[in-house]
Amino acid sequence: MDNQTRSTETPPPLTAVITGAGSGIGRATARAFLSAGFRVVLAGRREAELQETAAGSEAALVVPADITVPDDVERLFAAAVGAFGRIDVLFNNAGTFGPTGSIDELSIEDWNRTLAVNVTGTMLCAAAAVRHMKAQSPQGGRIINNGSVSAHTPRPLSAAYTATKHAVTGLTKAIDLDGRPFGITCGQIDIGNAATDLLAGIGGGQGALQANGTRAEEPSFPAEEAAAAVLFMASAPASANVRSLLVTAAGMPFGGRG
């Protein structure tokens, strides 16, 4: 094959692993990636919801997995590489809001569960992705962690969730630093008030609790627009990295959450 023929070959599609792909931002992002030509590995605990996200696409691979279980995570990434040969992007999206209430009312079980999903699960998936990204040829890849506005400023009575999202920020920075020699980048998207079931559950239909003790219905924006921001980060050239991106609904309370 001559050089001219090689230069006109179409590069293979990129492969992305998306956790929490059965609903909300994860589902919207998976569909955006599929529309953009990615091969997408859909991970989550509920297979039926993952299949609904995939909608029969031949470029989608459904892998039911609990990101808090190390063996599930290893199986997820082995399945991704087995099906598509490599991992170019990980969107660490799965998370839980956890319990609400004053920290003195927070049980150790609820605290540990929130950390297990939002921090340990994120770490386990990143670690598995990095191992494969180091080993593959060409080496490298991109990790995008889903943080939150709570990584900047908390909602009232959300100590566990807020602590985990600050931890994700630290993890993002460490992964990005340590990945440099291997062509692995890591960035974080902090999304405020995308219209998802998680957002709808805040306040139990009575509006979100504000810093002054009142409740108010807050602005929201479509999950598909959040997904477009994730796709923007994932589509950056290998020479660039979007380290941090904050995307909120226009008019959403931010500083002091009031």
What kind of feature is each model-predicted range?
Residues 22-24:
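Conserved glycine-rich cofactor-binding loop
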Residues 36-51:
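Conserved glycine-rich Rossmann-like NAD(P)H-binding loop of the short-chain dehydrogenase/reductase
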Residues 65-76, 108:
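The beta1-alpha1 cofactor-binding region of Rossmann-like NAD(H)/NADP(H)-dependent oxidoreductases
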Residues 101-103, 110-112:
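Substrate-binding pocket helix/loop in short-chain dehydrogenase/reductase
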Residues 126, 164:
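Active-site helix of classical SDR
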Residues 148:
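Residue(s) in the substrate-gating loop at a strand-loop-helix junction
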Residues 184, 188-189, 208-255:
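C-terminal helical subdomain
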